[in-house]
Amino acid sequence: MSGEESMPDEEQKQSEEEEEMIRKRTLAMRKKVEEIMRNGAGLVRESNGLPKAGADYELYNSYPTFNTFMKRSEQRLNALMNKVTKSIGCAMRVPDVGSSVEHYTECVIEAQDNIAERAATLHEALKKAELDEIVKVPEFITKAAPTNRKTEAEVSAAMRTFSANIGTVLAEKFRERREEAAQMVVLEKPQKTYNISSDNSQAPFSSKLTVKHHAIEKRTGIVLHDDDESGRRDWISAETETEEEHPYIAEILHFKVPEAQLKSAECLKFTALKDTPLTMIDTKEKLEALTKTLNSVKEFAVDLEHHQMRSYLGLTCLIQISTRDEDFIIDPFPIWDHVGMLNEPFANPRILKVFHGSDSDVLWLQRDYGVHVVNLFDTYVAMKKLKYPKFSLAYLTLRFADVVLDKQYQLADWRARPLRNAMINYAREDTHYLLYSYDMLREQLLKQDTKDLANVYSESSDLCIKVYKKPVFNPKGYLTEIKFRFTLNTRQDYALTHLFKWRDVVARAEDESPHFVLPNHMMLSLSETLPRDVGGIYACCNPLPYFVKQRTGDILKIIVEARDVKLEKVGLSAKERNDAQEARGVMNDTMDHITSVLKSKIDFSHTRFDEERGEIYIDKTDEGMDIELKDHKESLLSVLQTAEIPSVETMIVVEKGKKSDNQKVKKLLNELDKFVTPFECYQMMMITKEKQEEEERKEAERKKLEEGDLPKTMFSHHDAPINRKPEFDAKLLNVDTLKLVPDDPNKPKDPEPSPMEESSSEPQIFDPSRFTDDQLLSKKAMKRKRDAARRNIDVSVVLGESSSSSDPKKKKSDDDAPVEDFDYEKADSSAFEKPVRDNNADFDPFHQKYRLKNKTKKNMAMKKSSNRQGTINYKK
């Protein structure tokens, strides 16, 4: 007894020592981190004190000593960065000495990304280790064991080495996966090898069901009508009516869950995988034997492996079935036309079929083999009903069977034959533990609520009613598949529409998926760039798809036709945009002025909300505690008003009360997310106001144009001239001072004129001396006045004469002086016999510079001529 009691004490002491060691390591790590942060801050301060490029750095760098020191420092820093990154398993791409700052920045950012990625990988590995979701340990073959046993220190050192070199280990695993993928290459499509036909046309889907097993008799004399008020079924077309016709619709609607499935029963433990027999079904005889076996059991688990990339409609590659005692794997390729005989056990309402995530499996069985399911239990639906944190099959198996599933072949190409042992084991594990998991889920549902189990069966039956529909080509389907990063013009839209149609036609003809023929990003790149030749097409498609290379001429023809389309920038209509958003499930809520005013996130007028803190608290102290509705004017926010933790007494009252559905809170939170803020309301109001003002302005302009009151702003030479009114000085307030002739104070004033005399009187004359010529005359009149002043100048134009003989006081303008007759007999005719004066001697005040130049040239010519004649003047 003393020895047994000492063992727990030793274990407790050892655990305390481990905790103390972990605490010390944590404190040491924190000190190191703080030291690194302090050193980093000092490094930043020191680096800020260095000369800056573009300021003093060039001046300092002109000295050889500084230049040499900087190069050596750069080499030392590069070596340190390389050493640090290598020590943590992320070698850095160190730049050469003298590289630009941009190059250094790029290398440092790349190193930071690698370090962050490695840290995330290690963190994920630690989280999986806590949840026991680690990679399965391979089975070791028993051999001669070494005599020397490794100590705990050596084991911990080996683990640290593995942690430090995790990148190398992952690279090795990737290399092994590439080798396995090379061995699993499918040289020929199963559709050709096994002569599997598929209908890829636009025709509606027709069921492959040949014999309807377990059919119920239809009651005669009962007619069901499901029409609208007008008596017509306008909402169902002939095509949808054919496709939506489920062969077992009556059997599923009248299905009642057997009483044994609604009661508690013993959970039958599964047998070990290696102790369970496995049968491969690849012939018709084996398939018939399997059908008899399934008809004799009460329940079995089913799972499918599917391939979508190299088939237009898809291809079921493997069917896994597990009973309580045996596992079966069906290879459907050799017996494709005979798998339909499984419809007998699958449609039997007395046999339970257990699936996990059966929404797609049910449709694939209908499409390929004509097999329909009745009496289904979906473990995924049950996990959702029990509100598990995860809903995957791996989590379900880990929770109940304590087995970690290896999901490395989840996305493998299941068309490859022969199947590898690892792939066979992966397929077995998907159904081997499913029946035991069903037992555990059933008991938990019954323990939670008896209605929950019935609800799971009801929701599973809704999945069975689903009918497979063939994909119908939509000319505008690319709007839902492709996320655009730019606005399409008419040419790009033409190219994208026709490439999308061409891809669908080729995929249907060759039985390939549209994405295999031409991926979305390549189709978008071709439509955006519109290459002119084959080389441009190949540049947009990298790596080059097989059918693009084979049918380059068709693609080039579409692009050439797109280039001939008239170039216009068009956008999506509101209907097309809404249809695309609805197809993606991102339908935006329309918000008008009234709803934006009524719905607001921060309207707390009906609640006891603390506006100073600015928060709404939801009590999460107890997951099962119901939230009580408050009768504060029936406000939507009333359920969110409890900001303090309730007391124990309050919690007891709530627990004893009627439990409300927690979905109400989620629904209200979703409603709150749709509400708009006051600033968003203000923005919407401003946009509406701007639109209204713009419409009013356009309407006013339209009315003015119709009425002809809009003043003319553009003129041409055909328009009549406009008399410019003189500008008056605002300081001249007395109109009498502007009169040309002042009034005589001695003259008696005239009596007031009559209205007739006032209307016939002449307009008042103003004194023009109070205005400048620029204010009274136009530009042309000013030019004429300057020309006249230049012609009628009073300065003498003859050198030597003091003034003109004419007296300016006696000179009158042509307008004022009367025209007199000239008597030529009295004129002095000797005036015409005088010699002509020199034109250069005339005085022209506007051309004096030309006169001086000519005079200078003339004097220089006279000097040269005198020098040639030898006349030299000497000074006495």
Swiss-Prot record:
Keywords: Apoptosis, Exonuclease, Exosome, Hydrolase, Nuclease, Nucleus, rRNA processing. InterPro entries: 3'-5'_exonuclease_dom, Exosome-assoc_fac_Rrp6_N, HRDC-like_sf, HRDC_dom, HRDC_dom_sf, RNaseH-like_sf, RNaseH_sf, Rrp6-like. Residues 1-22, 690-876 are annotated as: Disordered. Its cofactor is Mg(2+). GO terms for molecular function: 3'-5'-RNA exonuclease activity; nucleotide binding; single-stranded RNA binding. GO terms for biological process: apoptotic cell clearance; apoptotic DNA fragmentation; exonucleolytic trimming to generate mature 3'-end of 5.8S rRNA from tricistronic rRNA transcript (SSU-rRNA, 5.8S rRNA, LSU-rRNA); histone mRNA catabolic process; nuclear polyadenylation-dependent antisense transcript catabolic process; nuclear polyadenylation-dependent CUT catabolic process; nuclear polyadenylation-dependent rRNA catabolic process; nuclear polyadenylation-dependent snoRNA catabolic process. It comes from the Eukaryota. Residues 279-445 form the 3'-5' exonuclease domain. It is an enzyme of class 3 (hydrolase). Residues 489-569 form the HRDC domain. Disruption phenotype: RNAi-mediated knockdown results in retarded growth, low penetrance of embryonic lethality, accumulation of apoptotic DNA in 1.5-fold stage embryos and delayed appearance of embryonic cell corpses during development. The keyword Hydrolase applies. One of its GO terms (cellular component) is nucleolus. Its main location: nucleus. Residues 690-730, 741-752, 834-847 have a biased composition (Basic and acidic residues). Mg(2+) 2 binds at D303, E305, D430. Residues 848-861 have a biased composition (Basic residues). It is found in: Nucleus; Nucleus, Nucleolus; Nucleus, Nucleoplasm. PANTHER family: EXOSOME COMPONENT 10, POLYMYOSITIS/SCLERODERMA AUTOANTIGEN-RELATED. Component of the RNA exosome complex. Interacts with crn-5. Catalytic component of the RNA exosome complex which has 3'->5' exoribonuclease activity and participates in a multitude of cellular RNA processing and degradation events. Involved in apoptotic DNA degradation. Involved in regulation of antisense ribosomal siRNA production. Involved in response to cold-warm shock. Belongs to the exosome component 10/RRP6 family. This is Exosome complex component 10 homolog. It comes from Caenorhabditis elegans.
